[in-house]
């Protein structure tokens, strides 16, 4: 089992570089499922849009999604890995919103080797998270949200399970168009380990702010992530994004993730380069019933990813 896990984790180095410091499991939960969030650097918890994928970043944002909205997502990740998601949102009265969602990562087929690095076969690996989301207007302009999730992971014949919650809070001032959020993600733990040792959840605390300017069709966003790791430098917490709002329904965005750029940098001194990792771009159209959002980014110096979201309100 140790050889299998080692080969598996090594092939996904880009996902777990920083996570390995705390030996966390289920690091697919760190990846964005929202194309809009991905376009703005990969981390955003404050954009207020009728976009069902945004509630995977902050459960409080489910309150902005139209009644009876279906959303699906797909990302070609790296090394044959594919990341997918789906959701359904339903409003309950004027203040409450409920949703169900699923996140699925398929890592494809990989080599299984023995202690001498001799191939003995192949194995598949995948992660699944099934989620229930609830958002409620706590006060004027303030919405709270919670996501309860069941996670299971398969590496060959080995399986682990976990339960967790996300807690989100958003304050949105529509006249000045300020949005501020606080989110705690992946609070919980394993209920079944691969073997004897129980792993940790990829817990994260994030704070974010977005501001749309009345005189300009521009929205700026800043998000601080991994605030439980006090020893990181400030840049490793920072994610910046900008939206150009072409109309009420159409946006173009770009972002920069300082930590990802630093982690993906290869080479030494003047020859060091992240090969574009850290930068991301995207765009979308959110009509009354139909939504389409796309983002391009590099989660590894040697590969690129495209994330697509589709939504439809019945």
Spans of features found by a protein language model:
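Sec-dependent N-terminal signal peptides
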Residues: 4-13
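Positively charged n-region of N-terminal signal peptides that target proteins for export
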Residues: 1-4, 140
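Sec/Tat signal peptide C-region and signal peptidase I cleavage site
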Residues: 15-19
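Subset of outer-membrane beta-barrel
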Residues: 20-314
């Amino acid at each position: 089992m140790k050889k299998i896990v080692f080969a598996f984790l090594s092939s996904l180095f880009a996902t777990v570089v920083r996570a390995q410091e705390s030996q966390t499991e289920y690091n697919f939960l760190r990846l964005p499922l929202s194309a809009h969030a991905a376009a703005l650097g990969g981390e955003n918890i404050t954009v207020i849009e009728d976009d069902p994928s945004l509630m995977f970043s902050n459960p409080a944002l489910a309150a902005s999604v139209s009644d009876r909205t279906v959303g699906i997502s797909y990302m070609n990740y790296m090394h044959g890995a594919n990341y997918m998601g789906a959701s359904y949102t339903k409003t309950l009265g004027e203040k409450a919103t409920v949703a169900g969602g699923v996140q699925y990562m398929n890592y494809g087929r990989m080599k299984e080797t023995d202690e001498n690095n001799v191939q003995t076969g192949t194995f598949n690996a995948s992660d699944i998270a099934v989620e229930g989301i609830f958002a409620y207007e706590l006060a004027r302009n303030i919405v709270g949200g919670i996501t309860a999730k069941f996670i299971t992971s398969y590496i060959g014949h080995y399986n682990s399970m976990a339960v967790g919650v996300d807690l989100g809070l958003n304050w949105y001032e529509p006249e000045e168009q300020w949005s501020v959020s606080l989110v705690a993600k992946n609070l919980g733990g394993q209920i079944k380990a691969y073997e004897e040792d129980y792993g940790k959840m990829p817990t994260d605390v994030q704070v974010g702010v977005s501001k749309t300017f009345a005189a300009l069709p521009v929205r700026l966003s800043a998000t601080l992530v991994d605030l439980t790791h006090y020893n990181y430098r400030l840049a490793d917490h920072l994610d910046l994004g900008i939206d150009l709002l072409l109309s009420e329904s159409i946006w173009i965005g770009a972002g920069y993730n300082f930590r990802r750029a630093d982690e993906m940098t290869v080479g030494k001194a003047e020859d060091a380069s992240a090969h574009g990792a850290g930068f991301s771009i995207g765009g979308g159209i959110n009509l009354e019933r139909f939504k389409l959002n796309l983002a391009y980014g590099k989660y590894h110096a040697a590969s690129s990813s495209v994330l697509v979201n589709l939504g439809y309100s019945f």
